[in-house]
Amino acid sequence: MYDATFSLPGHTMIEHSLWVPLDRFGALSRFAGDETAAIPEKIELFAREYVRHGNKKLPRLVYFQGGPGFGGPRMAPIGSWLDTALNHYRVVLLDERGTGRSHPIEAQAVSAVGPTPVQAAFISCFRQDSIAADAEDLRLAFGGEPWAVLGQSFGGFVVTACLSQAPQGLSEAFITAGLPSVEGHADDVYRLTYAQTDVRNREFFARYPGDEPVAWSVAKHLADVEERLPTGERLTPGRFRQIGICLGRSYGLEQLHFLLEDPFWTVRGARRLRPQFLDRIGAQVSLAPAPLYGVMHEAIYAQASTGATAWSADRIRGEFPQFRLPDVAAGAAAESELEAEG
């Protein structure tokens, strides 16, 4: 393991790098060697450790980020939960494989490994079971003392994988809002998600009734007028609807309200979306910081006992007519039809 140590006000920061196997569970073993020649046997795992001055002898706690697809938090200055945790632990912020500095994954890298079946097998090497195995290798590299684990959201799925695969390495386990089922199908998760999303939509428009006509105006405009995000992609009505992810957050109603502020202006007599509005929406819907989120989010709910998820989120949406999508070819007229349905 390679370490680099830095002195910060009140803290020592240590950056750890460790080489670990890519394919821990044989996902690539069914392919011939020449089919996987572009795939490395090992990848570099990165973690950043913080130690408060005077607390060098405290036990370690490793933090697993939510997602999937997001790296460990980069905090400057140190605050929030980390500030409190450092009074009790040396805290290790792990970049889970495929994120941050731990062999980050993006579309070009996946395309380069081979044909679609190889790509799918490659992506499967970045699940929570492999992340838990990486963490165990890191713990052993630190000397093997049991440590505490803390998982937020998807990080809780990693914690349960650690409890299953290497309980001997754990002194404590903390989970915040991420406890997976051991037998339920992804369909069950998405039925609950759509039902709760409907509730949150109603809460939002009850609190901010003026935002409902604004949202419909934007959707209808996007159905007929080409608008581009700062990154160059076209903003479609379907992608605009993805800002509803805010509704899953504690203060999401306010965040969504702020996103919808003052979307339009007039340019040479034409009604267009403001650049500032497009920038806010682009930042909200972009998966550029965490491309694995879009690819693997449904897969984290998979169970060996229930089989493939089979595009569960899309299938289950069909059970909820309030989330029916309009006919894209019909343009704004289809959006108006949906609006009239209430």
Task: Report residues per predicted region.
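Gly/Pro-rich cap/lid or specificity-loop segments adjacent to the active site
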Residues: 2, 7-232, 340
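Alpha/beta-hydrolase fold active-site neighborhood
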Residues: 226-342
